[in-house]
Amino acid sequence: MIGKATFSVLPILALVLFSLPSRASNPVQSGFDLPQPNGCHPIGTRTVVLKDRQRGRDLLVTMWYPAAEGTSATAPYMDKKTADALAAEWKLQPDFQRLVRTHARPQVPIAEHGPFPVVLLEHGSSVVPAIYTVLAEGLASSGFVVVATNHPPDSLISVFPDGHELRFRPYWPVEADRRAQGVAMGKFADEVLVADVRFVLDQLHEMNSQNHFWRGHLDLSRIGIVGHSMGGTTAALATQEEPRILAGVNLDGSTYPGMNADVRPVPVHKPFLFLATEEHAAGDSRAREYVGSDSNTYYVVVTGADHMSFTDARLISSRFTRDLKPDLNAFERALLTSTLTRSLVEEFFAKYLKAAVAPDLDLVVRVDKK
């Protein structure tokens, strides 16, 4: 549950101010545990490689899921090669990943009381799925199977089990104006990333019927999708275009001039939640894009957040930035936004994939088009 809240309702936007947790883990120690998940399920995790031979794409997919009880060691936050790439990009201390403790155990059996609804998790540009671990573990503990695809060349790095790597490279005209870049990024989202989503969904159907581990555990009649930044754009497009997806969440997703207008009509006619920073919410065009729906649509501005606050990034950087002392205040602010994001997303999917009550989500503005 989220802490006490006060809010004021503007014509379209809800500004929601949530209180800080009464106590936060101290990041000035040698390491720290990621925030404790809200749900009651133990968590498991495993990684699979999906080969799309028709398109010549190998996709590294990490899955978090409700697990059977057990006492085995928890999974590493990320592998060393991925951590080294992220440390170079974000100027983090070497081997920072060794000091971050997760809650998921690798390769453990899935809980027997399924099948469980599925949530696809889409990363932003030049990052990796592991920086959404707080969100993924929270959803898994609440009874969802989370499926996070690493999309080359949009991800910072993909490290495959056989050791080969794929690195980020721009897929837009770097020297072009903002509109031209936006159109190119929108086309990539629609033609590559959404196609990846469809392929992964197809593979999940096969895994649910043939694969020994997953067989019968995935409820593929209840599928949602959540994405951040470019992944948020992907989530919006996939929710709109893919009939198997029932509900979607966009975490401060990219909307460059012309991106969506030149690719697909924008309105999403399904339940949709948009969490935005104040910077992204400054213009009302973004609000009109996402509230132009005939279904339950939520548009929430998280005050004080920046674009990376919806990930684990600020938790990590406040503790492990190279050559700087840990910043406890920054850590607490990051903890607030991270747990707020997780709680709202969990309640949204509980409401629209499980028909559960959502007391905190219902505090924010809901737009119902009649």
What residue spans do the PLM features occupy?
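Domain-level recognition of soluble alpha/beta enzyme cores
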Residues: S25-V119, A330-A334
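Short substrate-entry loop that stabilizes the transition state in hydrolases
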Residues: R101-F116, L121-V159, P257, H280-A282
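Alpha/beta-hydrolase active-site loop
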Residues: V159-H217
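Alpha/beta-hydrolase-fold serine-hydrolase catalytic core, especially in secreted/extracellular enzymes
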Residues: N26-C40, G44-T45, K51-R53, D58, ...
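The feature captures the conserved acid-bearing segment of alpha/beta-hydrolase catalytic domains
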Residues: L246-M308
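Bacterial N-terminal signal peptides
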Residues: S8-F18
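Primarily recognizes the serine-hydrolase "nucleophile elbow" in alpha/beta-hydrolase
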Residues: F199-V266
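Active-site machinery of serine-nucleophile hydrolases
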Residues: W64-A68, T82-A87, K91, A130-R178, ...
